[in-house]
Amino acid sequence: MIINPYDALATIYGQGTAAYEVINDANNPKLDNAIICAGGGGLTAGSCISIKHINPECNVFTAEPEEWNDHQLSFEKNERVAMDTNRGGLCDGLLTPMPGEIPFAINTHFGVKGLAASDQAVCEAMRFAFNRLNLKLEPSGAVALACLLQNKEKFKGTRTLVMLSGGNVDQKTFSECLAKANP
């Protein structure tokens, strides 16, 4: 049996528990926004279901690297857009060719919008997380924070959940990213 990591309802529902737990641990705060990293879109879709159940007015955003922003482009065109898969990228955990069919339907239903961050912003987010939050994030796990930091004015004065997901980074990549980040 193969279970799709993002294009299966059971997986999406399971991934939605991450947002549910965060909201409950924070005593159900009134959120204005949530920014969630997206590869196939399952984590965003599941989280969106949980968030919108508790807080229907919350704006939900996918976070992706600029060169792999298939969700952002798909939301703008209101149809799934495929990316050129003949190239790599810093955020290798998010490099899916297009949004999953089921997650795209869920995310579109809830009015999710897309954000994208540059590799430079991702490196700066990794440095910020390491220096200020004592978290060692992989590039894919830092992209939501990168989107927040790259769009400070958009989110200024709001209560925004930023999903930091993933710390699976080799020391070479981590060191290179920290060196590239602006101090």
Role assignments for model-derived ranges:
Residues 1-183:
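PLP-dependent amino-acid enzyme catalytic core
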